[in-house]
From Swiss-Prot:
Protein name in the entry: ATP-dependent protease subunit HslV
Enzyme Commission no: 3.4.25.2
Keyword Nucleotide-binding: no
Principal location listed in the UniProt entry: cytoplasm
Active site: T2
Compartment list: Cytoplasm
GO molecular function: metal ion binding; threonine-type endopeptidase activity
Organism: Haemophilus ducreyi (strain 35000HP / ATCC 700724)
Reaction catalyzed: ATP-dependent cleavage of peptide bonds with broad specificity
PROSITE patterns hit by this protein: PROTEASOME_BETA_2
Organism classification: Bacteria, Pseudomonadati, Pseudomonadota, Gammaproteobacteria, Pasteurellales
Disulphides: none
GO BP annotations listed: proteolysis involved in protein catabolic process
Length: 173
């Protein structure tokens, strides 16, 4: 359970996430880093779901990026295919948002690789709260950057979602 949100605005893409890890109904850690840079710092990924599963998937995605020389869509599709067909990976419970400077995608274990129609994508238990906040901020006249919109969306989600906190990591490309 977490909040990961991605926003594209004015040629920049930002992904942010909270840092809370829960076990059942208890907070176990508040400083988990769920957003990371990959492939020569040109790709950002954020994950929601089981932490260990997400780390495995992030490592697999990084290998796909290296294999496909940083091609985001090809790497994401190859990861989704392997995730869905490999028996051991099928049981992994996590979702990822992956982004570079021009595109961003949702990747899931059911084989989904989705490019959103709007400039916002969010996952996790607080994802709908963050997505709503980010869309509202994108639709209003303001001078906020993609990174600032992500920060505000995470604050709102953290205020509402009990499985998200206010320890945020935000990366931008």
């Amino acid at each position: 359970m977490t909040t990961i949100v991605c926003v594209r605005k004015d040629g920049k893409v930002a992904i942010g996430g909270d840092g809370q890890a829960t076990l059942g109904n208890c907070v176990e850690k508040g400083t988990v880093r769920k957003v990371r840079r990959l492939y020569k710092d040109k790709v950002i990924t954020g994950f929601a779901g089981s932490t260990a599963d997400a780390f495995i998937l992030r490592d697999l995605f990084e290998k796909k990026l290296e294999l496909h020389q940083g091609h985001l869509v090809k790497s994401a599709v190859e990861l989704a295919k392997e995730w869905r067909t490999e028996r051991a990976l099928r049981k992994l419970e996590a979702m990822m948002i992956v982004a570079n400077e021009s595109e961003f995608l949702l990747v899931s274990g059911s084989g989904d690789v989705i490019e959103p129609e709007q400039d916002v994508l969010a996952i996790g238990s607080g994802g709908n709260f963050a997505k709503s906040a980010a869309l509202a901020l994108l639709r209003t006249e303001n001078n906020l950057t993609a990174k600032q919109i992500v920060a505000e969306a995470l604050k709102i989600a953290g205020d509402i979602d009990i499985y998200s906190n206010h320890n945020h990591v935000i990366e931008e490309v």
